[in-house]
Design a protein with these regions (language model features):
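RecB-family 4Fe-4S metal-dependent nuclease core
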Residues: 1-147
Length: 147
């Protein structure tokens, strides 16, 4: 899978690269966790950087709430506690993002609803995502495979 990326900023801190992405809204690094990350943007930037970055963070630039939220291999980013398991974290991101890319290139593009609050916006996308037709499609495919 070939994609183009546009990073906001890469800093060199004591010879280590740190990927920074500016955000004006609420941000959380926990959205990078798990087998299906909710927001894989910064982990993808880390994996794509050459040489590989040793940290990544959102730089929240919201009035009255300016802060860094992220992770790093060592004490590279103000207000961000370093991870003792940076190498393992990068390996987990590589596995998770690789699995997502493999699904996408295989034609798997299911709708993933992470929280019920975001589901209210799905009404506008119903003609595109077809999640409500999933049961009928699976039944039809099963019928065709048994014939």
């Amino acid at each position: 899978l070939e994609i183009s990326l546009k990073l906001d900023r890469i800093d060199s801190v004591n010879g280590n690269l740190v990927v920074i992405d500016y955000k004006s809204g609420e941000v959380t690094a926990s959205h990078w966790d798990g087998v299906r990350p909710k927001d894989p943007q910064l982990p993808l930037y880390v994996l794509a950087s050459e040489p590989q970055a040793n940290g990544c963070a959102f730089a929240q630039v919201k009035a009255g709430k300016i802060k860094f939220t992220g992770v790093s291999a060592s004490d590279l980013i103000p207000e961000v506690k370093p991870l003792e398991t940076w190498t393992a974290q990068v390996a987990q991101w590589e596995h998770a993002i690789g699995a997502l890319a493999e699904e996408f290139t295989s034609g798997i593009a299911q709708v993933e609803v992470f929280d019920s609050g975001s589901f209210q916006f799905q009404n506008y996308l119903l003609p595109l995502n077809r999640w409500h037709e999933e049961s009928d499609i699976n039944t039809e495919l099963l019928d065709k495979s048994t014939q």
